[in-house]
Amino acid sequence: MYIEMVDETGQVSKEMLQQTQEILEFAAQKLGKEDKEMAVTFVTNERSHELNLEYRNTDRPTDVISLEYKPELEIAFDEEDLLENSELAEMMSEFDAYIGELFISIDKAHEQAEEYGHSFEREMGFLAVHGFLHINGYDHYTPEEEAEMFGLQEEILTAYGLTRQ
């Protein structure tokens, strides 16, 4: 999985960037999404607040903002067209590969790690996996959706080795 990572805060260590990359690759493998692409940007609470207003019309910062990529334009080609035109086939493959982007608030991650009594590493892993599941169609609006998403989230974190301490 290709993951573009940007640290707007200047506060994310190389180790944390590596952990984020690894846990997202691990989650992608669990969901069969190894061939996908995404972006992760680490932000401050101030930037999270701005993004939350812009994309969700919510006037506060949040821990992770997940923007699932859903192209507005449906492009359909016959399989024959793709077989005959390798450039078109490659372009469509790249078009289908991008699944979305996450904005993770470093400030919120620190606050929540302290509040929930676990490590910053666990919280960052949790936020990355939580956001990843959102951009792959999982949600928690109903009790059934919540049970499915949170169960999968905990399964991934535990299998990766980030348990609650």
From Swiss-Prot:
Cofactor names: Zn(2+)
Q: Which family does it belong to?
A: Belongs to the endoribonuclease YbeY family.
Q: Does the keyword Metal-binding apply?
A: yes
The UniProt keyword set, sorted, is: Cytoplasm, Endonuclease, Hydrolase, Metal-binding, Nuclease, Ribosome biogenesis, rRNA processing, Zinc
For this chain, one GO molecular function annotation is: metalloendopeptidase activity
Sequence positions that bind Zn(2+) = H130, H134, H140
Question: Which protein, by its recorded name, is this?
Answer: Endoribonuclease YbeY
- What Pfam families does this protein map onto? YbeY
